[in-house]
């Protein structure tokens, strides 16, 4: 079996908004990496035993006292080191060079001219017409290195940055003032590949097939012949977790699928068909619509609704767990970003490790061990593994759906009538997006039920019925979003279908709010 952790890169985080991108690019190349706060100890680095180290960018200035710096051991470990932006500046300072605040800050696109072809820049050139090789890169810095440390040479320049990259080939230390991890840097992935493969000598063993093989072996080793329970929602993370566990322990996995009446149209049946019939998983389906609706009666405050939905789910999950006498383990779909918690960089910890539980607040007496086979994976890696395990692409690439489901898409009090109307209207919206080729062009699309009535005309009669709002957004990271400019003809078709086919809805509106100031979900 391939050891997927045999070669690994350690990324020390100085607080850059792009740091997770570095990790995702390294994984994309096929090499395992981990993301740690910059102030780790020598002991921790030795225990991790990295094949190479990357120092990330960050918002601080190396010219300030008490600015973050790499542990001294980084430069004594005998492994290649790549400093990116702030990482290059702290490398220069710590090894005897000099940095200064720049009169001209560089933000955005820049063309760097390569001066010396070292291993990092081997075979890279974005401008074949120029006399010197050039790279189109993305800059984002105020400070710059003004004096090289001993043993270093300048490898790239820009008109405003005379040391845009540097290297000490003997010690295998490299620094770049730009960000190779962002897609705006055209040859960024090739540069990182040069570092990881050619300089560090890492093999590409981090592949979906190898990850699956490793996860299955670890699950078998950890749980043996014990019984495991998993809350299956039909979402990407719990679905992939279920298939990995099923492959490892078969019928010893007990999936609890709680149908809370707040799911999309026919979703409960689809989950049972997919995981029960197609994959042969052992699934306990709990039809709990009445229990959830009863608990939500009269509640219209969004946070209160979320808490009730969470509590009722845990109560039901707990009831089912008690019925299974031999269960020793709880499986969860925790993924790597859940494990990394962002904190203010001023604390000196840009990212700290937190204990994260998807099923929050499980009773203490459920003394179960935890199995988290996706704990090392980013979301895109989870999707690739799901595809390799046989899950359909349409399911893996579905738009995000909130944990409380329609509980936060029906504004105000939740009633069965409202949920049914919303389910049917939303199904039409999504169907038309698929048919028109717009579903994958937008990042998220859904329908919201508004607890207001509006006058409409049907035939010769007037009707006084409910209003729904359509919402479709485009975003890269879900932190900010633009409303999607869907064609008027498409919006008209969707509106006509909903009003004609869903009895009880008289008006359809389209939400044209961006984030900020609005959030993506209404509640």
UniProtKB/Swiss-Prot annotation:
InterPro entries recorded for this chain? Class_I_gatase-like, GATASE, GMP_synth_C, GMP_synth_GATase, GMP_synthase, GMPS_ATP_PPase_dom, NAD/GMP_synthase, Rossmann-like_a/b/a_fold
**Active site annotated at which positions?**
85 (nucleophile), 179, 181
Tell me its EC number(s), please.
6.3.5.2
**Pathway(s) where this gene product acts:** Purine metabolism; GMP biosynthesis; GMP from XMP (L-Gln route): step 1/1
Q: The GMPS ATP-PPase domain covers which part of the protein?
A: 206-398
For the ligand (ATP), the binding residues are: 233-239
Q: Name one GO cellular component term.
A: cytosol
Which reaction(s) are listed as its catalytic activity? XMP + L-glutamine + ATP + H2O = GMP + L-glutamate + AMP + diphosphate + 2 H(+)
The Glutamine amidotransferase type-1 domain is annotated at: 8-205
| Single annotated GO MF | ATP binding
Q: What class of enzyme is it?
A: ligase
* Any matching Pfam family: GATase
- Function, please? Catalyzes the synthesis of GMP from XMP.
| Subunit and interaction comment | Homodimer.
Please give the name of this protein. GMP synthase [glutamine-hydrolyzing]
Q: Which organism is it from?
A: Haemophilus ducreyi (strain 35000HP / ATCC 700724)
């Amino acid at each position: 079996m391939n050891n997927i952790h045999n070669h690994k890169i350690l990324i020390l985080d100085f607080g850059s908004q792009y740091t997770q991108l570095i990790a995702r690019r390294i994984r994309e190349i096929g090499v395992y990496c981990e993301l740690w706060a910059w102030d780790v100890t020598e002991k921790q680095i030795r225990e991790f035993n990295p094949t190479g180290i990357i120092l990330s960018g960050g918002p601080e200035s190396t010219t300030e006292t008490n600015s973050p710096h790499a542990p001294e051991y980084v430069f004594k470990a005998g492994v290649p080191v790549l400093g990116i932006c702030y990482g290059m500046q702290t490398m220069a300072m710590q090894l005897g060079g000099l940095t200064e605040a720049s009169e001209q800050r560089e933000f955005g696109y820049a063309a760097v001219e390569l001066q010396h072809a070292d291993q990092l820049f081997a075979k890279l050139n974005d401008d074949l017409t120029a006399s010197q090789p050039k790279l189109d890169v993305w800059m984002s810095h105020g400070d710059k290195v003004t004096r090289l440390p001993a043993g270093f040479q300048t490898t790239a320049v820009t008109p405003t940055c005379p040391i845009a990259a540097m290297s000490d080939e003997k010690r295998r230390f490299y620094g770049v003032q730009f960000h190779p991890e962002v897609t705006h840097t055209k040859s960024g992935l090739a540069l990182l590949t040069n570092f990881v493969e050619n300089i560090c000598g890492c093999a590409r063993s981090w592949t979906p097939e190898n990850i699956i093989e490793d996860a299955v072996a670890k699950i078998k080793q950890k749980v043996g012949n014990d019984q495991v329970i998993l809350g299956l929602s039909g979402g990407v993370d719990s679905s992939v977790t279920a298939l990995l566990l099923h492959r490892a322990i078969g019928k010893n996995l007990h999936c609890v699928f709680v149908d809370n009446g707040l799911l999309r149209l026919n979703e409960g049946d689809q989950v049972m068909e997919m995981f029960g019939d197609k994959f042969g998983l052992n699934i306990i389906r709990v039809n709990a619509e009445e229990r959830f609706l009863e608990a939500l009666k009269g509640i219209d405050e969004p946070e209160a609704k979320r808490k009730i939905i969470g509590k009722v789910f845990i109560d039901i999950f707990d009831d089912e767990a008690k019925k299974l006498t031999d269960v020793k383990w709880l499986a969860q779909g925790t993924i790597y970003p859940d494990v990394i918690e962002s904190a203010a960089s001023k604390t000196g910890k840009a990212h700290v490790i937190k204990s994260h539980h998807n099923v929050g607040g499980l009773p203490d007496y459920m003394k179960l061990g935890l199995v988290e086979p996706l704990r090392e994976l980013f979301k895109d890696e989870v999707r690739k593994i799901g595809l390799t395990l046989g899950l359909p692409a349409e399911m893996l690439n579905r738009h995000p759906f909130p944990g409380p489901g329609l509980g936060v898409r029906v504004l105000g009090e939740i009633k069965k009538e409202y949920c049914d109307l919303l389910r049917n209207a939303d199904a039409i919206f999504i169907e038309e997006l698929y048919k028109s080729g717009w579903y994958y062009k937008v990042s998220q699309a859904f329908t919201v039920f508004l607890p207001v009535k509006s006058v409409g005309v049907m035939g010769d009669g007037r009707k006084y019925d409910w209003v729904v709002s359509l919402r479709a957004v485009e975003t890269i990271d879900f932190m900010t979003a633009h409303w999607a400019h869907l064609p008027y003809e498409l919006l008209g078709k969707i509106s006509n279908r909903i009003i004609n086919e869903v009895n009880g809805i008289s008006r359809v509106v389209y939400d044209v709010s961006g984030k900020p100031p609005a959030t993506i979900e209404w509640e």
